[in-house]
Amino acid sequence: MAVHYNKILSAKAAVDCSIPVSVNASIKYADQQRREKLRKELARCEKEFKLSKSAMQTNSKMNSKFFVNSLQRPSGEPQDQDVLIEERLTRYPSFSKSLIPSPEGLHLSLPESNKILMNGTQKYPSTAPPRYSGCGHGYDRRPRSAHQFQVVISKTPSGDLLEKHADLFSNNQSPFTPRTLKTEAKSFLSQYRYYTPAKRRRDFSDQRMEAETQTELSSFNSELGTAEKKSSKDSDVSIKQAPNYMRNGAEDKIAPLSLQGQNLAWDKSKDGILQPSSERAPCTQFSPDSKIYSDEEELLYLSFMENVTDEILKLGLFSNRFLERLFERHIRKNKHHLEEGKMRYLLHGLKVDLGCISEEEQNSFRIFNEFHFQKALTSRENRFINDTEAVNHHERQQYQEALNMLSSVPKDENKMFSFPGEFLLPAHKVKHSEGVIVQQVNDETDFEALPWDGNNPSVSDSFIDQETSVDVIEGDSDFEMVETSRELCCLSTSLSPSVPLPSIEGGSNHDKELSTLKIMEMSIED
């Protein structure tokens, strides 16, 4: 049976009734336990305070009665009471301040130093021996004083803390301005797997201080020198056709626009083609003659390019899409204190150095960036020159087609041809006369030439609804036919200046006026 009872006593419950771990780790449960502990401590302190208060009252009564008895003049002491009182006051300096005259007699007020809770013998007055036992015969038989001493302990201090403790505060007149504490502490959430902490933006003043704390500009010359050597090898490509050329009116001289003040150096080769100079300045360097920005601003641009290149090298991506997004983000970040045009110019040069843009596109970009205004001024003149050349070419082509058509006359008399200009070649033979007459016949009899209009230089519509009858008179021999065709081919140069050019005035087709042109009239002699 003992074994049986031991098993019963040592048996454990099937359900775990112990305090769960979550309760011990709970903040709410810990606060509840702490509040309960504080309540118990407060109750114990109140009880001790009541006991100490009653003990302090009895001790104060004993001390006051003893002091009053000691102030009375004994029989064997001198008669001068003033001297005696001064000696007693100097002997007890703590009670000298507590003497307050009142109509009911001497009233002793407890000094401020005694307002604090008594410790040691004052807590337990029953065990403490009396301090002055020699004088206990008289005050026991005297009646108790009606005025008892009370300890006043102020729990809440009265008055303003800034006025009471002004020495502990500085600038008490300044208004309250809350400040954000900047620390290097990391968030607890940064330990989680799917949490991406916010990136801290670098202050502009810190970047400027870093730039100013650098050494002289000579420290950057080594890096710029290597970049200049690399870029000078790629810049030895000649620009065959530059868009900033102006063609002078009648002459064919090509003169480049002035490049002074544009920070671009050009050399003229032997063939007359302009080429960029071999010593091409890097994208972050400018000529000292046209230097606008100060040294501090140049350092800011250098730090801007340094941040861009550092981020590119850190991520290791060099695609065009990535670079465009990265450049735009840095431009938006620095556009408030840096010039956007210069930033784009520097970033474009960086793209060329990275190989994302060819050198030809770089040269065209620079030329467009520097001379877009001059190009806008000369575009109208170039357009007029191109239109004039197109008109002249079209005229020569039409005259050449007409001469080729007339020179290739078929031997068959019954054949008739219809050409795009509606030239009709009815061939009939007259034996008595030897000559070729080519005459253009128009419906109207007005032979006045229309004035030339520069706005409508095209003459392709001028030959519509015109009929040209060509009478070919052949001789008896084939030799005359061959000779006639040769003479017609030689007339190409003499026809072009003598024929006036018709034009179309106005925008409607109803205002067209057709002119009668005499193409040629000649007689072939033997």
Swiss-Prot record:
Residue ranges, compositional bias (Basic and acidic residues): 226-237
InterPro entries, A to Z: SPATA7 (IPR029357)
Tissue specificity, please?
In early prophase of primary spermatocytes.
Q: Which GO terms describe its cellular component?
A: axoneme; ciliary basal body; microtubule cytoskeleton; photoreceptor connecting cilium; photoreceptor distal connecting cilium; rod photoreceptor outer segment
According to its UniProt record, where is this protein mainly located? cytoplasm
Record function comment: Involved in the maintenance of both rod and cone photoreceptor cells. Required for photoreceptor-specific localization of proximal connecting cilium (CC) proteins RPGR, AHI1, NPHP1, NPHP4, and RPGRIP1 at the distal CC, a photoreceptor-specific extension of the primary cilium transition zone. Maintenance of protein localization at the photoreceptor-specific distal CC is essential for normal microtubule stability and to prevent photoreceptor degeneration.
**What is this protein identified as?**
Spermatogenesis-associated protein 7 homolog
